Amino acid sequence: MRELAPDTILSVRDLRTWFKTKRLTAKAVDGVTFDLKRGQTLAVVGESGSGKSVTSLSIIGLLSRPGAIESGEVLFRDSHGQVHDLAKTSQRGFRKLRGREIAMIFQEPMTSLNPLYTVGDQIGEMIALHENIGRGETRKRALEMLGHVEIPDAANRLDDYPHQMSGGMRQRVMIAMALACNPSLLIADEPTTALDVTIQAQILDLLRRLQAQFGMSILFITHNLGVVAEIAHEVVVMYAGRVVEQAPVIPLFQKQKHPYTEGLLACTPNAERDLDPDGERKALYSIPGSVPPITALPPGCAFEPRCRYAISACTTIPPQLESAGANRLARCLRSAEI
């Protein structure tokens, strides 16, 4: 097992997660590599089908069959300094890590919370699973967590059921459950997608404050670059199961080194950019085409059929993830020209 840098909490190297059947193999994640530093937020961005959620499920050991890690290394440093290769960890090993060292929140809290149990019981169950404390202390800790996630009148909401809360409140409960045992790593899989813009901003602000308070690292999965600008330190852009660009957040927004990243940003509404010279509203830009099936990727660059910079070499030569400037990587034959 290789050594981790002192400030690195998660290091993924050449991760391949494939879904195999008798007829075909779907390479949902194909050679993904990135590092997440302690106390920072790494955003993984891409359209539906890019492989970002499968990457997160591979890390936390929640893949469904026939999905399986084919190869690669996922090194995680726990709160005691011990390094685990999550790609080789058994489900028994994951049960010790999930909740205590690594936690996850999902896109739709209503389907993640049990409708038959109160929110206090569900937060308390997470605490009782990992800590040897009595029921009274467990309930006290659950109440403290509701306070941390800023649920008003927490003492009276502790015995509420999920259906008695709004979508934003339920997501706060999910965050309280995830952070109940003070994990080192929080994986957030599109936690604001199902919320309206106002509540979305409140949840992002809450995550930033809790990160400063608890000192956790966050792996943030999203398709929304506006959210990335609010919360991330580093950005990984995925397309068709591969990383196509990686950079610190500010340089990425200032200048993109891959056409797909450029296209994603161009799709984001902008009040000034979306006006023509006469002041009329222009049609919102969209990237032409769609993500190719991962079972039938083109032989060259996977983005070539949709790319306005494509040349003949792009149809036959698979680009490699290479340096594109200081602390930047891009998978494009023409990244130096973009």
Predicted regions and their residues:
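Short catalytic/signature loops enriched in Gly
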Residues: R2-T8, V83, A155-N156, Q246-I338
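P-loop NTP-binding/switch modules centered on Walker-like glycine-rich loops
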Residues: E47, G61, I187-P191, L195-D278
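ABC ATPase NBD coupling module
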Residues: H80-A103, L129, P251-Q256, P292-P298
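Conserved ABC ATPase "signature" region
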Residues: E137-N156, L265-A266
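Conserved ABC ATPase signature
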Residues: D160-M165, M169
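A short, proline-enriched helix->beta-strand linker immediately N-terminal to the Walker B motif
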Residues: A180-S184
